[in-house]
């Protein structure tokens, strides 16, 4: 069994360099919620050095709230803003001898695109316009995955090690209790259940079906690196290969 392990990078956390030794894919902030041209270059350089797949992590234009504010943008605006961000990272990767492999939206752009078909379409269209060979990463079973498939893109369905799930397979909003799993044992058990058995127990006790093709590790948690190491070790014990 094989699984991709991804992390959001270039967001100002000191753990980036070490996380790049543990993950197989990096989602690099493109300036709209965090990061800038210099951090994008640095992250790309480190990803290439570690053999990690390079991806863009576009966001709503919301540096004040780290891309976590809901926005209602016209589809053409969402298309242009997404294309602008991923095009910049693609150029930076190419200039350093690398290749951008995937795109994963950030924060509320990701969450809204999981449910809003028009926004999902705008993002998928931007990814296709940039490079039809790119992989589009989205929440398992979401509108974004459906939109990507409609454009003929390769999609990758994502699950979260440290996020609570609702009965419909969506994430518990960060503003609600149960959104974040802080117990390491619970996060490990949830991840293995999703990867090995394709299901997750919701905060209300029901099982939801999920397709786990990539697991997100958050680099901003207090014990992010320790958990990443433990998850890698657990995957190795279970014969699960980590690869992009």
From Swiss-Prot:
A molecular-function term among this protein's GO annotations = 5-oxoprolinase (ATP-hydrolyzing) activity
Q: A GO term (biological process) for this protein?
A: carbohydrate metabolic process
- Going by the entry's taxonomy, the superkingdom of the source organism is recorded as Bacteria
> What cystine pairs are annotated?
none
The question of whether Nuclease is a record keyword is answered with no
Q: Which UniProt keywords apply?
A: ATP-binding, Hydrolase, Nucleotide-binding
Catalytic activity, per the record?
5-oxo-L-proline + ATP + 2 H2O = L-glutamate + ADP + phosphate + H(+)
- Enzyme's top EC category: hydrolase
Q: What is its EC number?
A: 3.5.2.9
HAMAP family for this protein: PxpA (MF_00691)
Family as reported in the entry's similarity comment: Belongs to the LamB/PxpA family.
Q: Its biological function? A: Catalyzes the cleavage of 5-oxoproline to form L-glutamate coupled to the hydrolysis of ATP to ADP and inorganic phosphate.
Spell out the subunit comment. Answer: Forms a complex composed of PxpA, PxpB and PxpC.
In its UniProt entry, what is this protein called?
A: 5-oxoprolinase subunit A
């Amino acid at each position: 069994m094989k699984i991709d392990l991804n992390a959001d990078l270039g967001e100002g956390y000191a753990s980036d360099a070490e996380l790049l030794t543990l993950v197989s894919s990096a989602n690099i902030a493109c300036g709209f919620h965090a990061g800038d041209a210099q951090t994008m270059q640095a992250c790309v350089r480190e990803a290439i050095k570690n053999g990690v797949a390079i991806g863009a992590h576009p966001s709503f234009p919301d540096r004040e709230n780290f891309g976590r504010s809901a926005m209602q943008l016209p589809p053409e605006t969402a298309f242009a803003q997404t294309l602008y961000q991923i095009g910049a990272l693609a150029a930076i990767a190419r200039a350093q001898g690398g290749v951008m492999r995937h795109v994963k939206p950030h924060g509320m752009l990701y969450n809204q695109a999981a449910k809003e078909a028009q926004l999902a379409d705008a993002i998928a269209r931007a990814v296709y316009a940039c490079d039809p060979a790119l992989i589009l990463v989205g929440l398992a079973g979401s509108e974004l995955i459906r939109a990507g498939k409609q454009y003929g893109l390769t999609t990758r369905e994502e699950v979260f090690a440290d996020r609570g799930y609702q009965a419909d397979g969506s994430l518990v909003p960060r503003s609600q209790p149960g959104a974040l799993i802080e117990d390491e044992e619970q996060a490990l058990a949830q991840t293995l259940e999703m990867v090995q058995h394709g299901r997750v127990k919701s905060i209300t006790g029901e099982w939801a079906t999920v397709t786990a093709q990539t697991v997100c590790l958050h680099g901003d948690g207090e014990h992010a690196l320790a958990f990443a190491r433990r998850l890698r070790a657990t995957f190795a014990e279970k014969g699960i290969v980590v690869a992009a």
